[in-house]
Structures are given as structure tokens and as C-alpha cells.
């Protein structure tokens, strides 16, 4: 497929986006417009058609995948299990984590250590809730997605060893959820099912 795209002089930005996409992509090449569609979940079978064949994309988007969403921001979390877009189980909540201290000196160091302890306690609690919600579905989960702030999610994943068992089914894109509460879960599953479309002439 790469050689075919190269022959058709696909812009470098498009071929790079396709190469870096964890889910693959589908190229629609018309006489006036071209589109790269990067679906939310991996394309498992390659194909080529001289007609506008949308069946593979249609089939993918109508799969009832079992999804785990784990959304974390400092002081807030939301965890949900979805069958397709239907919520099966969830837990949302808050925890105390102070904002960063900008002043220096010994008091700042004490505050930093105190804040790190708050984060550790918060992450431990969220990890336990993640286990409670995801473990009953662990063997059947198709994909796991994370949402929130990148640094917070990375720190949380390092501490929550339970989630490592889902690494093989974890998608690398980060859902942009500002408030991981009940409404945030609804936003999260909509974003989880969203495709990225790039058009060029």
C-alpha cells in the first residue's frame, strides 16, 4: 500500500500521518479531492478498490467494541466500561491534591513533599477504583483509552501496576477531557469513537 501511495505522490505530511497512526488509515482518492481517514480503532485487513469502497470503514464503525476509559486529572478521575457507546460500569470522584507552590526555600520543599504524598494517595485510590471497574471485564476488553493531562496520566500509569496488563490493548491517543466526571465520560466515549479526517487536493 505504501508503494501505491508513493506512486500517487501523496504529500509527505499525509504519508507520515498514516505511517504514525496506530490504527492505520483509509485513503479515498477522487478526481478533485483526496481524503485520509484514520479510524478510532485499528484496521485489521488491508485492501484496495478502484471504486469508493466504504464497507471496511462502515464495518469497523459498527463493531460493538468493549472499551475501558480511564480519565485522570489531578484531583479528579472518571473510569468507565462501555459496550459500543453504552455505559456498563463507571466510577467518578475527586481527591485533594494542592496546586504547585511557586515560592522557593525550605517551606517550598516541605510543600512539594506533601504534594507528592497527596498525589501518591490519590493515584492509589484511583488505581483501586480502576481495578474494581475493569477487572470484571478484563479478559474481554477490546481496547483501553486514557484521558486527561498527559503528565498526570503518565505518572498515574507508572504507579498503577494493575493497568499494565492492558498495555497490549491500550491505544496511544489521549482523550482531551477537561473534567473527568459523569459528563466527561459521555464526552470521552464520543471522542473515543471519532475518526480523524485529512483532506488534500
Predicted features and spans:
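Terminal alpha-helical anchor/extension segments at protein ends
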Residues: 1-201
Amino acid at each position: 500500500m505504501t508503494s501505491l501511495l508513493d506512486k500517487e505522490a501523496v504529500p509527505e505530511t499525509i504519508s507520515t500521518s498514516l505511517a504514525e497512526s496506530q490504527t492505520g488509515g483509509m485513503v479515498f482518492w477522487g478526481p478533485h479531492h483526496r481524503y485520509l481517514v484514520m479510524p478510532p480503532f485499528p484496521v485489521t485487513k488491508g485492501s484496495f478498490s478502484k471504486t469508493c469502497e466504504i464497507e471496511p470503514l462502515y464495518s469497523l464503525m459498527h463493531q460493538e467494541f468493549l472499551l475501558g476509559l480511564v480519565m485522570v486529572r489531578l484531583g479528579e478521575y472518571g473510569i468507565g466500561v462501555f459496550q459500543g457507546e453504552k455505559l456498563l460500569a463507571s466510577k467518578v470522584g475527586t481527591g485533594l491534591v494542592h496546586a504547585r507552590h511557586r515560592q522557593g526555600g525550605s517551606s517550598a520543599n516541605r510543600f512539594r513533599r506533601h504534594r507528592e504524598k497527596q498525589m501518591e494517595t490519590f493515584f492509589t485510590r484511583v488505581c483501586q477504583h480502576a481495578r474494581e471497574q475493569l477487572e470484571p471485564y478484563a479478559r474481554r476488553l477490546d481496547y483501553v483509552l486514557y484521558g486527561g493531562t498527559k503528565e498526570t496520566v503518565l505518572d498515574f500509569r507508572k504507579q498503577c501496576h494493575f493497568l499494565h496488563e492492558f498495555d497490549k490493548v491500550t491505544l496511544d491517543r489521549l482523550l482531551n477531557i477537561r473534567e473527568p466526571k459523569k459528563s466527561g465520560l459521555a464526552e470521552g466515549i464520543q471522542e473515543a469513537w471519532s475518526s480523524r479526517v485529512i483532506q488534500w487536493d
